[in-house]
């Protein structure tokens, strides 16, 4: 695996997480996700394992950047050791990034199909739903949250946040 690719994917995940809080982050997120799909498409010669870990790197960059506040809660408020607090944030980020990685495998498995964008969006929404329900019930950092001022804000009251997420992923494809 190329180290530069992993660094690029991690930084891209961090950028997407950082744009979520901007006033028009939903608009900025779509081209950044398009760049991510393009970058992952370049990895077509990777094995499934390498592809999984490449997309896991993106997810870790995304969640570590978005869950920085857990460090403050654990260390400053809870009194946990700084090293243990950092490790806890990285471990939680790695766990929830697994759902992104599994969803991104659909790009590798169906890259030549004309419905790969729909399959990616469907698997992404399924991954987000499972992330919200299984074990942790961790609903934070979903892509629908960025659509408050984004292009799909009007969809949320009628179809919900997962429909917004589906449209974000599909349009960025």
Mark where each language-model region is:
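Membrane-embedded alpha-helical bundles of multi-pass enzymes
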Residues: 1-173
């Amino acid at each position: 695996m190329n180290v530069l690719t992993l660094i690029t994917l991690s930084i891209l995940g961090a950028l997407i997480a950082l744009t979520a809080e901007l006033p028009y982050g939903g608009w900025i997120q779509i081209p950044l996700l398009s760049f991510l799909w393009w970058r992952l498409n370049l990895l077509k010669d990777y094995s499934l394992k390498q592809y999984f870990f490449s997309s896991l790197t993106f997810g870790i960059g995304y969640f570590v950047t978005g869950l920085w506040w857990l460090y403050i809660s654990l260390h400053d408020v809870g009194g946990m050791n700084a090293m243990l607090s950092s490790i806890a944030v990285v471990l939680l980020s790695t766990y929830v990034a697994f759902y992104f990685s599994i969803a991104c495998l659909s790009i590798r498995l169906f890259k030549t199909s004309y419905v790969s964008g729909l399959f990616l969006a469907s698997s992404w929404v399924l991954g987000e739903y499972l992330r919200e329900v299984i074990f942790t019930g961790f609903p934070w950092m979903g892509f629908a949250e960025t659509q408050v001022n984004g292009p799909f804000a009007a969809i949320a009251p009628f179809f919900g946040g997962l429909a917004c997420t589906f449209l974000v992923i599909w349009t960025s494809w």
